[in-house]
C-alpha cells in the first residue's frame, strides 16, 4: 500500500465504514445476539473489501465502534444504538443481504439502497393486529395455566388493552420502563374487574396471564447467548435490562393490587391453591401453545409464512415439557429444559429449510413455557408477607423454581445453537472464501 491515501480513497473508505456501522446498528436495534452481529459485520466487511486482519469491531448495547488499520493508516467510526426493539424480519433479511451482496457483486449504492429498504420496511403486522396477537398470546398462557375458555377471552381482552396502552405511552415519549408499569397496571385492573363477571369457572387465571406480553424473552435468551459466547459486558447489560423490565411489570401489578385492594379477596391464597397439574388433554394444551407462540411471533415481527412453523415449535416445546414433567416425573425445571432443547435441536436443521436465523424459530416457540403461576405466587407472597412462619420459605421456593425454569428455557435454546454454530462455522468460512475468490476472478473484489 502507498504511504499516502488520496482524498477520494479516504472518502470511499469512510463510506464503507459508515455502511458497516449502519448494518450493525440495525442488527443491534433489532435485538440480534452479539455473536450474530459480529458474524454479519465480518461478512459485510468481506464484501466491502475490508480484510478481517485489519478490521477491529467492538459491540456494546448502546455503541458500535469500527476501526480499520494497516500499520500506516488508522480510521475509526462510532455509531450509537438507541432505538432498541425486536424485529426478527430485519435480522433475517440482513443476513440474506450480506450473502447476496457478495454473490451478485452489489455496488455500494445497491447495498445502501437494500439496507435502507430493510430499515424503512413496514412491519409485517399493523399495530392493532399485533395487539390482537399479544392478547391471544396471553390468552394462550391463561389456558396453559389451567383457565377455561371464558378466562381465555377475558385475558385476551385485558392484554389487548394493556398492549395498546404501552404502545401509546411509547408514542408519547414516556419512559420505556414506566410504559411497561402502566401497561401492567391497566391489564391487571381490567383482569380484576373480570373477577366479578361471574362467567368463568376459573376467574383468577386472567390475573396470572394478562400482563405476560411484557415477558422479555428475547433479551433473556440473548443474555444467556452472550454470556456463553464470552460477550460478558453486553450480556450483563441485557441481564440488567431484563431485570428492570420484570421489575417495572411487577411494580404495575403491585400498584393495581393496592389500588383495588386485591388482598381483600385473598387472591394470594387463591394463587397458592391453583394446581400445577394439567387438567386438560394434550390437544387442548397444543392449541393453547400454538396460539401463544403465534401471538408472540407477531410481537417479534416474524414473517407470516413462518407462523405455522412457530406454532408447531410451541406445540413440541409444551408437550415435551409436560411429558417429561408429569409422565416421566422429572419436574418442571428439567421438563422446561428438555422442551426448549428439543425445539432448538430441530431448529438447527430447520433453519436450512426456511432460510432464517435460529432464534427466529426458537424464541417464540419456547415462550409459552414461561412459569406464570410460580412467578405470581412468588410476587404475591413477597408483597403480602405478615410475619407468619413459612412465608419466606414459600416465596423463596417459588421464586427460585421460577427463575431456574426461565434460565433452563434460555439454556435449552442457546446451548444447541452455540454448538451447532461451531460445527458449521468452518463450512461457512470456506463458502465465504470461495465466493470472494469468484469475485476476484470477476474483477469485482477490491481490497483496501
Regions found by a protein language model. Give the residues of each.
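Short juxtamembrane and helix-loop transition motifs at transmembrane-helix boundaries
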Residues: 109-122, 135-147, 163-174, 263-277, ...
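Core alpha-helical transmembrane segments of integral membrane proteins
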Residues: 123-222, 299-300, 304-309
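Structural signature of hydrophobic alpha-helical transmembrane segments
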Residues: 142-158, 203-216, 270-289, 329-341, ...
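Hydrophobic alpha-helical transmembrane segments in multi-pass integral membrane proteins
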Residues: 190-200, 250-264, 321-333, 374-390
Amino acid at each position: 500500500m502507498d504511504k499516502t491515501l488520496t482524498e477520494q480513497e479516504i472518502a470511499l473508505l469512510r463510506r464503507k465504514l459508515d455502511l458497516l456501522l449502519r448494518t450493525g446498528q440495525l442488527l443491534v436495534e433489532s435485538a440480534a445476539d452479539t455473536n450474530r452481529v459480529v458474524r454479519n459485520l465480518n461478512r459485510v466487511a468481506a464484501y466491502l473489501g475490508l480484510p478481517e486482519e485489519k478490521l477491529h469491531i467492538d459491540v456494546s448495547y448502546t455503541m458500535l465502534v469500527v476501526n480499520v488499520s494497516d500499520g500506516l493508516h488508522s480510521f475509526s467510526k462510532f455509531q450509537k444504538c438507541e432505538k432498541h426493539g425486536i424485529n426478527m424480519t430485519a435480522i433475517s433479511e440482513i443476513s440474506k443481504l450480506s450473502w447476496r451482496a457478495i454473490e451478485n457483486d452489489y455496488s455500494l449504492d445497491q447495498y445502501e439502497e437494500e439496507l435502507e429498504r430493510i430499515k424503512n420496511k413496514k412491519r409485517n403486522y399493523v399495530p392493532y393486529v399485533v395487539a390482537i396477537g399479544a392478547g391471544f398470546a396471553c390468552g394462550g398462557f391463561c389456558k396453559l395455566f389451567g383457565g377455561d375458555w371464558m378466562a381465555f377471552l377475558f385475558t385476551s381482552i385485558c392484554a389487548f388493552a394493556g398492549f395498546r396502552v404501552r404502545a401509546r405511552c411509547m408514542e408519547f415519549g414516556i419512559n420505556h420502563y414506566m410504559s411497561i408499569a402502566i401497561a401492567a397496571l391497566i391489564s391487571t385492573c381490567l383482569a380484576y374487574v373480570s373477577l366479578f363477571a361471574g362467567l368463568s369457572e376459573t376467574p383468577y387465571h386472567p390475573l396470572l396471564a394478562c400482563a405476560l406480553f411484557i415477558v422479555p424473552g428475547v433479551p433473556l435468551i440473548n443474555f444467556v447467548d452472550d454470556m456463553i459466547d464470552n460477550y460478558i459486558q453486553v450480556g450483563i447489560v441485557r441481564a440488567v435490562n431484563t431485570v428492570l423490565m420484570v421489575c417495572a411489570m411487577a411494580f404495575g401489578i403491585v400498584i393495581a393490587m393496592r389500588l383495588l385492594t386485591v388482598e381483600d379477596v385473598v387472591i394470594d391464597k387463591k394463587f397458592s391453591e391453583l394446581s400445577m397439574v394439567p387438567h386438560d388433554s394434550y390437544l387442548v394444551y397444543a392449541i393453547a401453545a400454538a396460539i401463544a407462540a403465534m401471538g408472540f411471533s407477531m410481537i417479534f415481527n416474524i414473517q407470516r409464512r413462518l407462523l405455522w412453523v412457530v406454532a408447531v415449535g410451541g406445540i413440541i416445546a409444551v408437550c415435551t415439557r409436560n411429558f417429561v414433567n408429569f409422565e416421566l416425573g422429572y419436574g418442571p425445571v428439567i421438563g422446561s429444559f428438555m422442551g426448549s432443547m428439543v425445539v432448538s435441536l430441530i431448529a438447527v436443521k430447520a433453519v436450512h429449510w426456511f432460510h432464517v436465523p435460529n432464534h427466529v424459530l426458537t424464541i417464540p416457540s419456547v415462550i409459552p413455557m414461561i412459569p406464570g403461576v410460580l412467578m405470581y405466587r412468588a410476587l404475591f407472597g413477597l408483597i403480602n408477607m405478615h410475619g407468619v412462619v413459612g412465608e419466606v420459605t414459600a416465596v423463596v421456593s417459588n421464586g427460585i423454581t421460577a427463575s431456574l425454569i426461565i434460565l433452563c428455557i434460555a439454556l435449552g435454546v442457546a446451548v444447541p445453537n452455540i454448538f451447532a454454530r461451531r460445527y458449521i462455522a468452518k463450512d461457512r468460512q470456506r463458502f465465504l472464501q470461495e465466493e470472494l475468490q469468484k469475485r476476484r476472478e470477476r474483477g469485482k473484489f477490491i481490497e483496501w
